Amino acid sequence: MATNVLNSIRERGFLDGQFLIAMPGMFDANFARTVIFVCAHSEDGAMGFILNRPQRLTFPDVLLHLQLLDPDEVIRLPSTTREFQIQAGGPVETGRGFVLHSDDYLSDSSIPVSDDICLTATLDIVRAISRGEGPVKATMLLGYAGWGPGQLEAEITQNGWLTCPAQEELIFSRNLDEKYDRALALMGVSPAMLSTDSGHA
């Protein structure tokens, strides 16, 4: 059912489940050389997450801040849990956390955003990850990128973004520095081929 809905949206020209790849002419420092995964797009605007910006906070920092664990419990966490990746998802609501994850984990608050990827923004998934009971693939993002009605479409028309279908492996890759060039490679494009004033895909 979710897949049918997503296909219908794409047929109407919306970009749910797509990558936005910033063109060289993107002079807004918030978005220069970014790869964004679009989670929602309609006549009312768009929402997505930057996939290649690091975040200083660690997962133990988040657990302590939310008072989900005490310091002694955090110390005893397995290294894979302590190193769970947190990224800066965008300039809007930077104190709010979101988890993009594979669809093997679902709660009442999980929202499908592509055929195999869901979004959960409640504490239940943070608790599950801290207990080793979370999804197989996941990344936590603080903040998001948002656009008002028609804003994203205008930016694309003005050659601000390239677009292409998202790739799950790239979404969850921990190698943030490589994501921009790898996203371009999905389209058969290299950074050297782009100019600040040439077209979008």
From Swiss-Prot:
Q: Which GO terms describe its cellular component?
A: cytosol
Question: Transmembrane stretches, by residue range?
Answer: none
Per the record, the domain of life is Bacteria
| Family as reported in the entry's similarity comment | Belongs to the UPF0301 (AlgH) family.
Name of the featured protein? UPF0301 protein Smed_0532
Query: Organism, per UniProt?
Result: Sinorhizobium medicae (strain WSM419)
Q: Could you read off the lineage of the organism from its UniProt record?
A: Bacteria, Pseudomonadati, Pseudomonadota, Alphaproteobacteria, Hyphomicrobiales
